[in-house]
Amino acid sequence: MSGSMEGNAVSFKGGVFSPYLTTRLPAWAGVRQNVMGSNVDGRPVAPANSATLTYATVGSSVDTAAAAAASAAASTARGMAADFGLYNQLAASRSLREEDALSVVLTRMEELSQQLQDLFAKVALLNPPANAS
């Protein structure tokens, strides 16, 4: 889309061929939402806020590949969101690793506490209290 400013009016030359840009506007802006559109070749274009998340492109094969990748990613994300078992398994293994690390830290702290008590006992033997005569 290109535009030029002439006085107080804006003149647009070209067009926007993406339903994504228009469907992001609020309904009160006069934009039709969830309405099947078409591209410049007349092929149907689903709106960006539809459940299919498929886009027809008017550009190069790179645009087609990008649209296919975006659609596949959205489909995968929906599938992962529906599969709670995957998330539970990942969360369980992470919590087990965290518990193992915490157990190692607690064991080391107990060892250090014991060493500190031994050191206090040795210092007490070397430096008896002054009032114990």
From Swiss-Prot:
Principal cellular location given in the protein's record = virion
Which parts of the chain are coiled coil? 97-127
Q: What domain of life does the native source organism fall in?
A: Viruses
Keywords per UniProt = Capsid decoration protein, Capsid protein, Coiled coil, Host nucleus, Host-virus interaction, Virion, Virus entry into host cell
Q: Induction of this protein: by what?
A: Expressed in the intermediate phase of the viral replicative cycle.
- InterPro entries per record: Hexon_assoc_IX
Which one of the record's GO molecular function terms can you name?
hexon binding
Offer a single GO CC term for the protein. Answer: viral capsid, decoration
Q: Where are the transmembrane segments?
A: none
Instruction: Determine if Coiled coil is one of this entry's keywords.
Output: yes
Where it sits in the cell: the answer is: Virion; Host nucleus
Give the record's GO biological process terms.
symbiont entry into host cell
In which family does this protein belong, per the annotation?
Belongs to the adenoviridae hexon-interlacing protein family.
In the UniProt entry for this protein, what further remark is given in the free-text comments? This protein is only encoded by mastadenoviruses, and may therefore play a role in mammals tropism.
Quaternary structure (record): Homotrimer. Interacts with hexon protein; this interaction tethers the hexons together. Self-interacts with adjacent proteins. Interacts with kinesin light chain KLC1; this interaction leads to capsid disruption at the nuclear pore complex during virus entry into host cell.
Comment, domains: Three N-terminal domains of hexon-interlacing protein form triskelions between hexon capsomers.
What job does this protein perform?
Answer: Structural component of the virion that acts as a cement protein on the capsid exterior and forms triskelion structures consisting of three molecules that stabilize three hexon trimers at the center of each icosahedral facet and fixes the peripentonal hexons. Dispensable for assembly. During virus entry, recruits the anterograde motor kinesin-1 to the capsid docked at the nuclear pore complex thereby subjecting the docked capsid to a pulling force.
By its UniProt entry, which HAMAP family does this protein fall under?
ADV_CAP9
Protein name per the record? Hexon-interlacing protein
